[in-house]
Amino acid sequence: MTATLERRESSNLWGRFCDWVTSTENRLYIGWFGVLMIPTLLTATSVFIIAFIAAPPVDIDGIREPVSGSLLYGNNIISGAIVPTSAAIGLHFYPIWEAASLDEWLYNGGPYEMIVLHFLLGVACYMGREWELSFRLGMRPWIAVAYSAPVAAATAVFLIYPIGQGSFSDGMPLGISGTFNFMIVFQAEHNILMHPFHMLGVAGVFGGSLFSAMHGSLVTSSLIRETTENESANAGYKFGQEEETYNIVAAHGYFGRLIFQYASFNNSRSLHFFLAAWPVVGIWFTALGISTMAFNLNGFNFNQSVVDSQGRVINTWADIINRANLGMEVMHERNAHNFPLDLASVEAPSINA
């Protein structure tokens, strides 16, 4: 009898826990994805803050030349970063217990791998939590689909690119100047500016900014005034009101006359789908581009210069880009390589033969 009561009580306890986790009445929804998201993101955030402030220098290139990234070792907010895991570790899973000591783990950049892997798991669970909450509320699932774009981008630079290049040391440093350094080196080694998928990403980001500004300004300019001239127009809106808060016909008419009729949406639903889809698809393509360049399927190159009938080079913009890429590659890991990889490789065949 006692065992039966204990079993029933424990099952009730588990049931109450399940109800609490999946309840949409909580101030912040937890959900089953949140059960994994909360500890992983807390771990990533805590280790990032501690390492950004106090981590010792890391031997990023595996050549016994440690690079300092923390504030206590001479950096500021701009130059500081979590330095990626050493090339000596490569792609090995490197938790604290795999190192001989904590000092060795820090010297080899263990915190970077710890932060990145927990962060990626955490943001993936955040995306799942968005879907889960939408499901519980009877909403459509497109919020999680939209969030998949930044998740894909983060996964590309923190996981797919290191896998393709063979080492976590090639991942993006976790800092402001480290991000810019990653971008410059990426251009030098992969010519990303000449990759069509990056171009689509640029169109997505800048186009999304343009469309967001256009939409916001059109709505703000065509509000249906519910207040006097002495009050803010914003005060005329009541949360949850059934009436339209702006005149979409007026906005449609304005924009249709500003450009041409069919450049303007007359359907609010298709308009907002477009506003969401444009940047999301662009960032998807950029993440896909990073993932292909990770395995050295690079942007277009024009290594063969245009020459005249006498064999003299006719300089084009491609030649300037090539020279800039070589210059950036020479400066990258200057003590790890004697020559940039392009100059050390076999000479390109002549096209005059």
From Swiss-Prot:
Marked site positions, Tyrosine radical intermediate: 161
Post-translation changes: Tyr-161 forms a radical intermediate that is referred to as redox-active TyrZ, YZ or Y-Z.
EC number: 1.10.3.9
CDD domains on file: Photosystem-II_D1
Gene3D superfamilies (UniProt xref): Photosystem II protein D1-like
Site (Stabilizes free radical intermediate): 190
Record GO terms (molecular function): chlorophyll binding; electron transporter, transferring electrons within the cyclic electron transport pathway of photosynthesis activity; iron ion binding; oxidoreductase activity, acting on diphenols and related substances as donors, oxygen as acceptor; oxygen evolving activity
Main location: plastid
Binding site for pheophytin a: 126
Entry binding sites for [CaMn4O5] cluster: 170, 189, 332-333, 342, 344
Prosequence residues removed at maturation: 345-353
Residues modified as N-acetylthreonine: 2
Residues bound to chlorophyll a PD1: 198
Keywords: Acetylation, Calcium, Chlorophyll, Chloroplast, Chromophore, Electron transport, Herbicide resistance, Iron, Magnesium, Manganese, Membrane, Metal-binding, Oxidoreductase, Phosphoprotein, Photosynthesis, Photosystem II, Plastid, Thylakoid, Transmembrane, Transmembrane helix, Transport
Cofactor binding description: The D1/D2 heterodimer binds P680, chlorophylls that are the primary electron donor of PSII, and subsequent electron acceptors. It shares a non-heme iron and each subunit binds pheophytin, quinone, additional chlorophylls, carotenoids and lipids. D1 provides most of the ligands for the Mn4-Ca-O5 cluster of the oxygen-evolving complex (OEC). There is also a Cl(-1) ion associated with D1 and D2, which is required for oxygen evolution. The PSII complex binds additional chlorophylls, carotenoids and specific lipids.
Binding-site residues, a quinone: 215, 264-265
Residue ranges of the TM segments: 29-46, 118-133, 142-156, 197-218, 274-288
Subunit structure: PSII is composed of 1 copy each of membrane proteins PsbA, PsbB, PsbC, PsbD, PsbE, PsbF, PsbH, PsbI, PsbJ, PsbK, PsbL, PsbM, PsbT, PsbX, PsbY, PsbZ, Psb30/Ycf12, at least 3 peripheral proteins of the oxygen-evolving complex and a large number of cofactors. It forms dimeric complexes.
Protein name as catalogued: Photosystem II protein D1
Phylogenetic classification of the source organism: Eukaryota, Viridiplantae, Streptophyta, Charophyceae, Charales
